[in-house]
Amino acid sequence: MKVFKDSVIYLVGELSSKLVPFLLLPYLSRKLGVEGYGSLSYYQTFLSLFLIVVSLTQEGAISRYFYFYGKRSLNLVVNTGYAYTTIIGSIILIGCWIAQSEILFYAALSSIFQSFLNVQLSVRQCQKKAWSYAFIQFSLTVTGAVFTVALLEYYQNDLVEKRILAILLSNLVVWFFSYFLYRKSTTSKKYQFKHYQSALFYILGFGLPLILHYASFFLKGQLDRIFIYHKFSETDLGLYAMGAQLALVVSIAIQALNKAIIPYFYEALKQKKLVVQQLHKWALFSFLLIPIPALIMWIIPEDVLVWILGSQFVGTKYYFILFLISTTLSIPYLILVNYLFYYGKNKLISQCSVLSTIIYVASLVALTFTEIKYIPYAGIIGSLSIIPILYFMTSKVSKTL
């Protein structure tokens, strides 16, 4: 009953927090236009890339530390991770300053505070503080919307840059208050240099093997935008990116359920109540759910989307449907990969990701030389390819336990 209650809280929190940006789409689509939205999508690609580098999946390291070693020295790992993010982030900021790119500077700074905030969310997830987690998420999106509207209404030029700046301000404000509350609830303790060194090695040991894994996610989620930006037009990218953004609603629901279930999933594995054969059955049955969102969207007339987004976005529905298919393929993926995460098989996860990414990139390159309407199929091919690989890897790991 507890897992169901938390799942509902996480789901409602995630959906309500993302509802504001979703409602903001008609405003952004009209304010930026299809070309401006395409340009925004391009620069958000760099924000995602910077986040991978400065974060080094600290939220995952925090979660695993909590369940394996307890909460006694959790603050040591949190602060050490923050120090790493600050140093690496500063190097990226210097690079942006040398390149004299103000918009990339904002993107880099935003990635730093987003990494800080992700750690705070991970701590609350580990502590099963579902309400606190949901409140932070909702606060982040509300402040993001307020800053976005304020900046885009006040300024008339460089609106894409102002949208990135709004994201930065939102991350900064919400992280400041969430960290303030975290510090109030945490007992201060002095640690020696060797303790910080051990914590850093733990973070690096957890995160570095996963660099390829998350780099693979970046390539699958962002590389297509770079290809389209340079191969086709900003208008084409705007339609494509809008379809992907709309499909994000389903992804949010899936991720919310996953985050709510993970603590109980790990506990079941720890107590030997869950075996790999059950996970394989769940992954297989989940394929029945994959076509449902796309079929629902196929029935809805495109006029509805055009009415919401504006007349410039005719053609978005086609991309929306295809992205829904590739998005829902994450359900069997998460079922299988969480098993490997629990047992710390990060190298295996990276190997799986690299193999599927190679397949995806090869498909993307080939499809780029056709027409833009075929490019979303690269995502479907890449998402499908990793599932049999994970099936084999989870079976292999279960035999060694």
Swiss-Prot record:
UniProt superkingdom: Bacteria
- The answer to whether UniProt assigns keyword Cell membrane to this entry is yes
Topology relative to the membrane: Multi-pass membrane protein
Can you list the GO cellular component terms from the UniProt entry?
plasma membrane
This one is known as: Lsg locus putative protein 1
Q: What keywords were assigned to this record?
A: Cell membrane, Membrane, Transmembrane, Transmembrane helix
A Pfam family of the record is Polysacc_synt
Q: Where in the cell is it found?
A: Cell membrane
Query: What is the native source organism of this protein?
Result: Haemophilus influenzae (strain ATCC 51907 / DSM 11121 / KW20 / Rd)
Please give the family membership noted in the entry: Belongs to the polysaccharide synthase family. HI_0867/HI_1700 subfamily.
Q: Which InterPro entries match?
A: Polysacc_synth, PolySynth_Transporter
